[in-house]
Amino acid sequence: MPACSDGLREDIFNELKSRKSDALSRYFDENPELKLYKYRSGAERDVNALKAGKVWMGCAAYMDDVYDSALIPKEDWLKLYQYMCSKEPKFKEDRYAQVMNSQGKMFQNELYICSLAETAQNEDLWARYAGHHSGFCIEYSANSLIHAGRVPFPIYYGDINRSLMELNAESKPDMLFDIILKKSAAEWCQQGEWRLIDWYSSLGITPGDKGILVDVPTPTKVYCGKNASAELKESLLSASACINIPVVFDA
């Protein structure tokens, strides 16, 4: 299956900002067998979620990239806060500092994400999220996710400009796409990330909650890491038998 190229990711991103989805729809139509992958550590809760047909939607405030889905870069807040303190000394009080620091996470606390990858052979992802091949990787059909109302969106990597000091009524909708579907850090580029996205209100949780398990279609396959324990292998065999999917060992 061909990966979603950098150029296509940019085209999809720009179209979504223009309230279109032609490029994304075409990509799905041209790649009906597209598979996306979720890397898991191998903890008991991961196996239980697999067996129950669920994935974890995590709060963006707890992502590895501290600026992921953040509305305001730290330096913008610092300049604004310093200016306010120079004009009014009371803003130096702890209670104001706490409020200022929390505002930068406004969207992060409201946005919930499940990150997926384009391949089950990404060494960086096996290392980061699956315990250096001691965990496992779950394969999902993108088409099944779409039909279940969980549309995956590809992340676009480029320059980000999402400062509160430039936010107004006209720019806000476009900036939301920058916040949700764009990353700037080059170190994340090789992950080929796609995202399932939802808001706290749709999930029935409180902003800032760490996350929630949501229903997804039955996976198509599970890859068990080559360094997985005998206990995990047995657990995956049991779970996969319950949902009738194959397990590939020594991934």
Task: Please report, for each region that a protein language model flagged, where it lies by residue.
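Partner-binding and oligomerization surfaces adjacent to conserved cores of proteins
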Residues: M1-A251
